[in-house]
């Protein structure tokens, strides 16, 4: 799974995804891409599940780029623990995805296979998405 090698701080604020993406809104590598419509927090496990679903559909042909990286540590308190006594331990890593952000890109496969792979990857993510083409 994706995780940063080094961090400046162990824990982070919860934060919100409010505005549209300022960067990463256009296709940079592939011919087809998966673009977010909503702003939401996507975990490293969800990104990995989407990657596996897409590569399995592509039968390991072509190339898949992941344009997002989980760099925000999300902390969680254990079950049945009373309020207070500090913030919980870091549990997993996530990325805050803004609306309009390209998350996956595909190149080197036929159009119908690329569209199917991106649909399968989209089903694994908690964000509403749409598929974009380079020539649109």
Curated annotation (Swiss-Prot):
SUPFAM superfamilies: Ribosomal protein L16p/L10e
Protein biosynthesis in keyword set: no
Keywords: Ribonucleoprotein, Ribosomal protein, RNA-binding, rRNA-binding, tRNA-binding
PROSITE patterns with a match to the protein in the record: RIBOSOMAL_L16_1, RIBOSOMAL_L16_2
Gene3D superfamilies: Ribosomal protein L10e/L16
Gene Ontology cellular-component terms listed: cytosolic large ribosomal subunit
Paired cysteines (S-S): none
InterPro entries registered for this protein in UniProt: Ribosomal_uL16 (IPR047873), Ribosomal_uL16_bact-type (IPR000114), Ribosomal_uL16_CS (IPR020798), Ribosomal_uL16_dom (IPR016180), Ribosomal_uL16_sf (IPR036920)
Single GO biological process annotation from the record: translation
One Pfam family of this chain: Ribosomal_L16
Highest rank taxon of the organism: Bacteria
Annotated GO MF terms: rRNA binding; structural constituent of ribosome; tRNA binding
Function: Binds 23S rRNA and is also seen to make contacts with the A and possibly P site tRNAs.
Assembly mode: Part of the 50S ribosomal subunit.
Family: Belongs to the universal ribosomal protein uL16 family.
Cited HAMAP family: Ribosomal_uL16 (MF_01342)
Name this polypeptide is given: Large ribosomal subunit protein uL16
Organism: Rickettsia typhi (strain ATCC VR-144 / Wilmington)
Gene name in the database record: rplP
